[in-house]
Regions:
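Transmembrane beta-strands of outer-membrane beta-barrel pores
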Residues: 24-30, 54-58, 67-73, 104-106, ...
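Detector for outer-membrane/organellar transmembrane beta-barrel domains
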Residues: 58-61, 250-345
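Surface-exposed beta-loop-beta
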Residues: 169-267, 271
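Residues that define the transmembrane beta-barrel architecture of outer-membrane proteins
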Residues: 40-48, 79-84, 133-137, 144, ...
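Membrane-embedded beta-strand positions of outer-membrane beta-barrel proteins
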Residues: 20-22, 65-67, 100, 141, ...
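Short loop/turn motifs that connect adjacent beta-strands in outer-membrane beta-barrel proteins
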Residues: 11-18, 54-63, 94-99, 147-149, ...
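Outer-membrane beta-barrel "beta-signal"
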Residues: 141, 274, 387-401
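Outer membrane beta-barrel
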Residues: 53-170, 203, 375-377
Length: 401
């Protein structure tokens, strides 16, 4: 990183841009907590995120710094800070770029579950949907050719996943001891990971093929010797993935699939579905997107209770055989008002979860958001049984600067 920054001495001056956001959030749980030590009712918190960017006058050199922090009144684990992004990027005159530092990379096409999105670790204290990610240290070389784009990654500095604390909601029956992770076999915190991705457009097809070898971002768990907590266990895995999207007028056909080895038996998982958009409904400028997806996961999962070092199972998942349906409504107004709602049903036991999200800009610098998640008819053997009392409603007000 320092060597890369040394090259800036010969670059033109450029300009700095500074922005960011501060938000106040209130989350309400209408049902009493299911487990001891968990709080009831209200969970107020606040976040601050800065955004500092510099680009040289010739556009070849770029610096991005995006720190993030949250202060939570109920869950100590949710009070945390992270460098979401902090990198230097060089853009050549020809067809390649080089990025050095911490960054966020997104792969995927579907709505319900991002199977192929493997580069960044999930910031699990932020929300249950796994959309929030921690910054990942990396060296990324991107080649932009006529035959497509090739991204090559070297990923030092593994990030462990964050989880709610003993007093937090949306957790398992036993809290997770994030201070004592276990790295099995060749996995270790300092191990270097590697990844590559090829992507391109072929007519109406958008295709991505990826490979990853390194420490899994998705831990399995074992019970701590005290019996009072779970310990996350991180394995070394090799994963290949494919994501596709086909555009046909108002139809978007989407799919993601992975094959993973290193966590029990090698297994396949996939998500496939569509989004169909109805334009200008009710003779208004509103666009309604209708979504449907099927989720399959063939892993042999479960708690790992055997002695460390024996053959491991894969991390457990709630998506072995599920159907997701949803709707996305864009009002296309000057306030960027939008809504998204979805329902997931477990085909095997009929457990059901749903969410509703809505947001609207207030003036030039403010945004209001509402989010609700609900759990219905949850089977006691379903992974969601630990959060069946954790229906919640969140209101968030953000000021941009």
């Amino acid at each position: 990183m320092s060597a890369a920054l040394a090259t800036l001495g010969g670059a033109s001056a450029g300009e700095w841009e500074f922005g960011g956001e501060v938000a106040g959030e209130v989350r309400y749980f209408p049902q009493s907590a299911q487990f001891p030590d968990q709080f009831d009712d209200w969970q107020p918190s606040g976040t601050l995120q800065a955004d500092l960017r510099w680009k040289s006058d010739d556009g070849k050199h770029q610096i991005v710094v995006v720190p993030f922090g949250r202060l939570d009144a109920q869950d100590d684990n949710r009070t945390h800070a992270d460098l979401r992004e902090g990198y230097y990027r060089y853009v050549s005159n020809s067809d390649w770029t080089l990025l050095i530092g911490a960054a966020k990379v997104f792969w995927g096409t579907v709505e319900s579950r991002h199977l192929v999105d493997v580069i960044n670790q999930t910031d699990g204290v932020e929300d249950i949907d796994e959309e929030d990610k921690l910054g990942q240290p990396m060296v990324k070389l991107s080649l932009l050719k006529g035959w497509g784009q090739l991204d090559l990654f070297v990923l030092p500095g593994f990030r462990t996943r964050t989880f709610p604390g003993p007093e937090g909601r949306l957790r398992f029956a036993l809290p997770i001891d994030t201070d004592n992770p276990i790295f099995e076999r060749n996995a270790r915190r300092g191990a270097v990971d590697y990844a590559a991705r090829y992507s391109n457009f072929f007519g109406n097809w958008d295709v991505g093929v990826s490979a990853f070898h390194g420490t899994s971002r998705e831990p399995r768990f074992t019970i701590a010797p005290t019996g009072a907590a779970l310990l996350p266990v991180y394995d070394r895995i090799t994963q290949g993935s494919l994501d596709v999207q086909y555009t046909a007028g108002a139809w978007l056909w989407k799919g993601e699939a992975i094959v993973r080895g290193g966590q029990g038996k090698t297994f396949f998982a996939g998500v496939a579905g569509f989004e169909y958009t109805v334009y200008q409904i009710f003779d208004k400028p509103w666009d309604l997107g209708l979504l449907a997806e099927y989720l399959y996961d063939g892993r042999d999962d479960g708690f790992v209770l055997e002695t460390f070092g024996l053959t491991s199972a894969a991390p457990f998942t709630a998506f072995q055989n599920d159907v997701f349906t949803g709707a996305r409504l864009a009002f296309n107004d000057t306030q960027d008002t939008s809504m998204l709602a979805g329902v997931s049903v477990d085909v095997d036991d009929s457990s059901l979860s749903m969410f509703v999200e809505a947001e609207r800009r207030l003036g030039q610098n403010w945004r209001a958001e509402l989010e609700s998640r609900l759990f219905f008819n949850v089977d006691p053997a379903n992974l969601a049984a630990s959060v069946r009392n954790d229906d919640f409603l969140t209101f968030r007000l953000t000021r941009y600067f």
